[in-house]
Amino acid sequence: MSYEERVNAHPNLGDESDVEEEALVNDYREQVNFDDGMSELDRTTSLGTGSQTQDLQAQLAAAATPLEYQATLETKFASYDNYCSLFHYILNSEGPVELEVPSYYWAWDVIDEFIYQFESFCRYRNRVARSGSNEEEAQLLRENPNTWGCYSVLNVLYSLIQKSQINEQLAAIKRGEDPLAFAGEYGSRPLYKMLGYFSIIGLLRVHCLLGDFSLALKTLDDIEMNKKAMFARVMAAHFTTYYYVGFSYMMMRRYGDAIRMFSHILVYVSRTKNFQKGGNSYDAIAKKNDQMYALIAICVALHPTRLDDTIHSALREKYGEQLLRLQHGGPDALPLFEELFRSACPKFISPTPPDFDNPALNIDPVDHHTAIFMDEVKNTLYNPTIRSYLKLYTTMDLKKLAGFLEVQPEVLRSWLLVNKQRSRQVRWVEGGLLEGEVVSANDLDYALENDLIHVSETKAGRRLVDWYLRNLARVY
């Protein structure tokens, strides 16, 4: 079958359509009942023989197996050495390693566990350095600063991407060309193609954990966020991708795009949850599911918008009273913003080893990013109150509004400027995830002419036809 025939074998569905959502759900049902669907990638058979192939398969199986929760420091060191040995063999052998890939799930499990162990080791090392209570472990960590080092992990991920030429293949798919023409000697092998592809998702995650949110989104330039993407075939990868993309958007103050990402995956999960129960990743997905609802609550409070009915109902059920407090704003909402952010944010890590000799100098990365986020919240704390007054007028004197709010006119002027600036957001339309158009993020706009505020409001009508069609489909 030619490349064009393979592409045309799948319907060309709109990214935002209900038909696509149904296709995603049906695809997930098939995955639950039949763990395959990658025959195009599995066409290469294993040429490896004897004990070498068996040993490599054993290493791959071990790499995809989670460490015990209470693993010792020596075990974590040994696990790092095993990963180094495995990836060195795959990347530096004379010619491609020939091995039959059991399934595309396997490659995700390897990359996912590799990054999880890196993340948990970094947090553990930082905790030991800050507490200063275990001198023996501190000494071991001090003597091995490069173990689970940030540079080593990034080097592995970038090397797998480069060796597989996966970005070139994905770019070719976007242009409608055959990716095999750009795959090269290594990228045509399922082993390298799968590891390279999921390494891109891994880079998104690592850069987000390090706090570089724009670079995190940049790594996905060649991946299309739709049902035809390979990550959508693995539920855990699908969920992880949308979580980190949505969170990166939120930290870049692109709340509309963050809500769109969170809503997409949460609707999908709500329609497939009966098929997930009993799966290995069900508990992790359920936890991330709750975290994303918390993040949507934060985004909606900072960027009021209409949500999908499914999301809105679930959000009111989970955070009804808390959501009202967030949307009301004011100093009383600050502790709630911080509580939800801490419970739902990634477990950030530091790119460098901590200072074991000066524990007081080490900062918890989660505290650092929470402080940055809370500074942004404080800047917009009075926006809901200001909006509630401005909605009542078409023109208003600055001093009069300052009197209502019991603040100085110049303080109010600064609030108005911040509010107006925050109402202009970049919104994705097409192209890379970092691209977009600057749009007005809410239905209320105003202009200052000396001390006179001119207010204009645009009310978007509810799309009742879509609402009726969606609910009729659910009933019948």
Swiss-Prot record:
UniProt cross-references to Pfam families, sorted A to Z: Paf67
PCI domain: residues covered: 257-452
Alphabetized UniProt keyword annotations: Cytoplasm, Initiation factor, Protein biosynthesis
Subcellular location: Cytoplasm
Biological function: Component of the eukaryotic translation initiation factor 3 (eIF-3) complex, which is involved in protein synthesis of a specialized repertoire of mRNAs and, together with other initiation factors, stimulates binding of mRNA and methionyl-tRNAi to the 40S ribosome. The eIF-3 complex specifically targets and initiates translation of a subset of mRNAs involved in cell proliferation.
Name of the protein described by the UniProt record: Eukaryotic translation initiation factor 3 subunit L
Keyword Cytoplasm set for record: yes
Quaternary organization: Component of the eukaryotic translation initiation factor 3 (eIF-3) complex.
Cellular component GO terms, alphabetical: eukaryotic 43S preinitiation complex; eukaryotic 48S preinitiation complex; eukaryotic translation initiation factor 3 complex
GO molecular-function terms, A-Z: translation initiation factor activity
Gene Ontology BP, a term: translational initiation
Native organism taxonomy: Eukaryota, Fungi, Dikarya, Ascomycota, Pezizomycotina
Primary localization class, coarse: cytoplasm
InterPro entries: eIF3l, PCI_dom
